[in-house]
A protein has these predicted regions:
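Nucleotide-sugar donor-binding/catalytic module of glycosyltransferases
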Residues: 1-123
Length: 123
């Protein structure tokens, strides 16, 4: 049954140009049982403010700010903060297809898999 909570972890560093598109694409997912964890990795632009603005209007969004430690450290912080049964990573300049998370969860459950991945699409 497709109802497992998915933690969407997004490391953020100086992504103000692409970040709104990324967050909007996650919020538009057809699979709604998600939490979005935005880890600002010491951005010097307006990325942290953008993260906070979205968190103020959707309680599924958590914002964590840390000094710059790199993308791997940011992902690890996101894992530690996650509450979902499944975890997926999205880069802050990515845009997801509306059914992207649904398809990953469906494949995990249909095939009793431990992991699912998705391909990149360049437009």
């Amino acid at each position: 049954m497709l109802n497992h909570k998915v933690s969407v972890i997004v490391p953020v560093y100086n992504s103000e140009v692409y970040l709104p598109m990324c967050i909007e694409s996650i919020l538009a997912q057809s699979y709604k049982n998600i939490e979005i964890i935005l880890i600002d990795d010491g951005s010097r632009d307006n990325s942290l403010e953008i993260c906070k603005r979205y968190a103020n209007v959707d309680n599924r969004i958590k914002v964590i700010h840390q000094e710059n430690k790199g993308v791997s450290a940011a992902r690890n912080v996101g894992i530690d903060a996650s509450e979902g049964e499944y975890i997926t990573f999205v880069d802050s300049d990515d845009e997801l297809l509306t059914n992207g998370i649904f398809l990953l969860v469906k494949d995990i459950e249909d095939f009793d898999a431990d992991i699912a991945t998705a391909s990149k699409i360049y437009v």
